[in-house]
Design a protein with these regions (language model features):
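Alpha-helical transmembrane segments and immediately membrane-proximal extracytoplasmic
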Residues: 1-408
Length: 408
């Protein structure tokens, strides 16, 4: 008797699904452990930096030189970072070197210790994908490479950020626009939930700010939400466009990576210290907290964080883009909320999820981020804003290797 096929495209049977689900438990524990270590050390280093800002940030050029040396000496294919993950997912490459794990972890810690404006989530996605892909050779499954990458990406995202449903849909939709890998939904969800639970049990805390007051949707409110979606979509587009442009232009102007990071980070250091004494260093969680808690947000906070993050990453420093995107969106939302007469915490949350969605070309993941971080009371506004943000962005993405499903 043949086992029933779940998907013609994936060629998965129920037996495959059970096997993958059992593996997902092991994967979730491993990646959750790695995420907990990575995340807790990063938080500790960031707090240490904030207490010794004027001693550490001036050493950013030296940290940059060390990062470039480590990548030049040891990286090989791993230097492609998320680009390599996407290439493997599209069967354009067949290996993710395990050395990516210590390399991207240590260099991201260095970037944050010395004040670079960068994120962490992209690193966690790489860590999860690398761990999971290492096991794919032991499983005789059709399209095993993509399946295991997807599960690992979800575990990495979910373990660090502890939004397992959002992490699941991020991994399912990000590799190819317009295509959801639904046949592997269950094992991907299991991997993400187990990783999230593991990292939480190991002391990694989740950021959440529940907004209990729900917004009543009428025509006027709908139009305001549509305008917000377009504004946040443009901000996400701007980040993705400038990041791609800056990497090309800086590399063209300063082709030697050592000169590039040394000269560029001297300028970056001055900017980080001059502009409100380190306000834009690190992840941007300070801006997120100020935005949702009603603190002081300046009109240009979002733009300065955007530009300094682009500059940091274009020089060769390591770290993800996602948490700065959250900060950019939240601070822009805090600025726009009074203009439209809407609650600041809610609009900050809408910006938080939709600038991320626009920059990554994802639709479902940001909506679930809204639900898991800010609560389900405003799920409809999340969806409306995200729909309009997604409307104006179908090709620009922080992930240059992302593909689009061709319409038949």
């Amino acid at each position: 008797m043949k086992v029933r096929q779940l998907s013609d495209s994936q060629g998965l049977s129920y037996l495959h699904l059970v096997t993958l689900s059992l593996y997902a438990i092991l994967l979730g524990v491993l990646v959750g452990l790695i995420d907990a270590v990575f995340g807790r050390v990063l938080i500790g280093l960031s707090e240490f930096r904030d207490h010794h800002l004027f001693y550490l940030v001036p050493a950013l050029p030296l940290a940059g030189l060390l990062i470039v040396y480590l990548y030049q000496k040891f990286a090989g294919k791993a230097a492609q970072g998320m680009g390599l993950i996407f290439k493997v997912g599209h069967n354009e490459e067949d290996q993710v070197p395990l050395r990516l794990i210590p390399l991207v972890t240590v260099t991201t810690w260095l970037t944050h210790l010395f004040g670079g404006s960068a994120g962490r989530e992209g690193v966690a996605v790489q860590l999860g994908a690398t761990v999971s892909h290492a096991f794919s050779r032991y499983f005789k499954l059709p399209n095993a490479s993509r399946i295991f990458l997807t599960m690992g990406m979800a575990a990495g995202f979910g373990g660090l950020f502890q939004t397992p449903i959002a992490a699941t849909f991020f991994a399912l939709e990000v590799l190819t626009l317009g295509q959801l890998s639904l046949p592997i939904l269950v094992p991907t969800l299991i991997a993400s939930f187990v990783a999230s639970t593991t990292s939480h049990l190991l002391g990694l805390e989740k950021f959440s700010h529940f907004v209990s007051e729900s917004l009543t949707i009428d025509l006027g409110t709908f139009m305001k939400l549509a305008l917000l979606g377009l504004a946040f979509g443009l901000a996400g587009n701007l980040f993705a466009y400038l990041l791609s442009l800056a990497k090309k232009k800086v590399a063209s102007l300063l082709p030697n990576p050592y000169y590039r990071v040394l000269l560029g980070s001297v300028v970056l250091t001055c900017l980080l210290l001059i502009l409100w004494k380190g306000r834009y260093t690190g992840l941007g969680t300070n801006l997120i907290a100020l935005s949702v808690d009603g603190g002081t947000i300046y009109p240009l906070d979002w733009l300065l964080k955007l530009l300094l993050t682009v500059f940091t990453l274009s020089l060769g420093f390591q770290g993800g883009e996602v948490t700065p995107l959250f900060a950019i969106g939240a601070s822009l939302g805090a600025v726009l909320a009074p203009v439209l007469g809407l609650p600041i915490p809610l609009v900050a949350g809408l910006g938080y999820l939709s600038v991320f969605g626009s920059s990554t070309n994802t639709l479902l993941a940001p909506i679930f981020i809204g639900v898991e971080v800010f609560g389900p009371a405003n799920a409809v506004p999340y969806a409306i804003v995200m729909a309009f943000a997604y409307l104006i962005n179908h090709k620009t993405s922080i992930y240059g290797q992302q593909k689009m499903l061709e319409m038949q």
